[in-house]
Amino acid sequence: MEISTLEKTLQIVSRYVIITLSISIMTIGVYFFKFPNNFVFGGVTGGAALVAKLTPLSASAFSSCANILLLILGWIFLGRDFAISTGWATVVMTAELALFEKYVPLSGPLSDQPMLDLVFAIALPAIASALLFNVGASSGGTDVVALILKKYTHMKNTGEALFITDLAMVLAACFVFDLYTALYSFVGLTVKSLVVDAVLEQMKMCKAILIICDDKDPICDFVMRKLVRGATYTPCYGAYTDRPHYMIYTTLTHRERSEEHTSELQSPVSIS
């Protein structure tokens, strides 16, 4: 069943809202917690921290140049839609970094507790990355390289691909910054990779749903049009009443199975 133009438009708008919010979360983690502590978990932002330390070039300028080059690779190997959404993410992140540098300049870390800063420097970008991957986008940079590796090699986990692509940047931190910063960065990279996989796994987790109903048409229509999911149905009979029913089988995420969605159904149903 075809999806209407309005529904397609709403899906696209929703996707780009998620991308924009995810990038904002990532930028806050990177600018306020990662850059001031010289944490290098890899990626273009990690390279930006190294470049900003060694040269007069700003982090935002380096990020712009590197992301453009990697975006071209994304277009070639991962497709047009991925490149466009990642390009939007790159533009938003570059703009937000430039705004923070101009209006909220930092002379040092926000706190005197590196471990506390490390928690936020890991958690915010990792959660944001998982949200981006879940909608078929990325923040650009070495995330693009990681997704190319995952697509064209035998790697099954996004976190594993991220770890491999970002490891070189962390090793470089050993020579640019002090040993403690390098150790913090290595711990951060490892935990970030695990968090990305954990969040992605949770978001993609689906449950098999059996729906017993008398009228299959509105429910199948709802599942296919509103939730954009497939469904299979078969006639069945109640063991106690011997009345005929339909049993519909589908898979839904926790959000899709929530009361907010199922309450829209008008037909009496039994969901298990």
Q: Each predicted region: which residue ranges?
A:
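Intrinsic disorder/low-complexity segments
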Residues: 1, 228, 267-270
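Core subunits and conserved enzymes of cellular information-processing
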Residues: 2-215
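Cytosolic, membrane-proximal regulatory domains of ion/volume homeostasis and mechanosensation machinery
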Residues: 11, 192, 196, 200-209, ...
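Single conserved hydrophobic/aromatic residue that forms the stacking wall/gate
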Residues: 260-272
